[in-house]
Amino acid sequence: VHLTAEEKSAVTALWAKVNVEEVGGEALGRLLVVYPWTQRFFEAFGDLSTADAVMKNPKVKAHGKKVLASFSDGLKHLDDLKGTFATLSELHCDKLHVDPENFRLLGNVLVIVLARHFGKEFTPELQAAYQKVVAGVANALAHKYH
């Protein structure tokens, strides 16, 4: 991902304030509600029948936290996202057969959740930087598909 020094600094500074558990659970939950076809990968999570059930589901929250913990690792290695996410890309491609488009969707949902949580602090410039990051992460996760 090609970020300016200012963008890297702003992305890192905001991320330090992120509650990974809360934001991760909300982002994954919203993905499953807004794009219901993504639920097929999470059938073992139990009740996903309503938006309320999804957003309160402890397995969704736990996996969302796990997803954002991986995203945090990516932020520490912005110059080598493909290397950082190689194992996860392989898992999602070869074993889980996740549509790589879902990574892009989740990235966009994450940006929305960050905007919701940080309000005015999530400036258009910061959003632009985060869009670059989530696009880079989605690309790295889709790498094994190519």
Curated annotation (Swiss-Prot):
Heme b binds at H63, H92. SUPFAM superfamilies: Globin-like (SSF46458). Residues 2-146 form the Globin domain. One of its GO terms (cellular component) is hemoglobin complex. The keyword NAD does not apply. Heterotetramer of two alpha chains and two beta chains. Belongs to the globin family. This is Hemoglobin subunit beta. It comes from Balaenoptera acutorostrata. The gene is HBB.
